[in-house]
Design a protein with these regions (language model features):
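Flexible, polar/acidic helix-loop-strand segments at domain edges
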Residues: 3-47
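Extended, hydrophobic/aromatic-rich amphipathic alpha-helical segments that build helical scaffolds
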Residues: 25, 42-73, 88-102
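Long, intrinsically disordered, low-complexity segments
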Residues: 35-38, 43-45, 82-161
Length: 161
């Protein structure tokens, strides 16, 4: 195992920061997989947790009470702390906990208006050690040049021209 520095002034080394293992290629009974090249682990396309969180977010955004859905998720995860009221911060935190390292955090932050603003900062956001806001055009991806070349009616997203 690599010795890692949790606190760092640079992000250039392989052993800087934390590492997390979420998925492992073992069978549910703990035995090795049948073929080392191909995983035996199923990949969920849509999880029940995503349905609960999507509904909770919709209810919250319409001014309703989303505590039932959040507490149901927490119950399934053996979390004993129930929420009494759901806030925007509670929702974005629940999305982060439930889908940690599953590749959807950026879209969640964009949807909550936190990706480019100083409403939510992380180390090295915007190239600053303690984080800083960045230009709002980063909320969208650039359109591939090949797509633009194939469609004269299409133009590049602002900020990427």
């Amino acid at each position: 195992m690599y010795k890692r520095q949790i606190q760092t002034d640079a992000i250039s080394g392989f052993t800087d920061g934390l590492s997390i293992v979420k998925w492992q290629n073992y069978r549910s009974d703990g035995k090795p997989v049948s073929h080392a090249t191909y995983p035996d682990t199923d990949i969920p396309l849509f999880r029940l947790a995503e349905a609960y969180l999507t509904r909770a977010e919709a209810i919250f955004r319409q001014g309703g009470d989303a505590t039932g859905d959040i507490n149901e998720l927490r119950k399934r995860a053996n979390c004993t702390r129930k929420v009494q009221t759901v806030t925007e911060q509670e929702l974005i935190d629940e999305w982060a906990r439930e889908f940690y390292l599953e590749g959807r955090r950026r879209s969640d932050l964009v949807r909550f208006g936190m990706f480019t603003t100083n409403k939510y900062l992380w180390d090295w956001k915007g190239g600053a050690m303690n984080g800083t806001s960045v230009a709002s055009y980063y909320n969208k991806y650039p359109i591939p040049v090949s797509d633009i070349n194939n469609n004269r009616n299409m133009s590049q997203n602002e900020g990427y021209k």
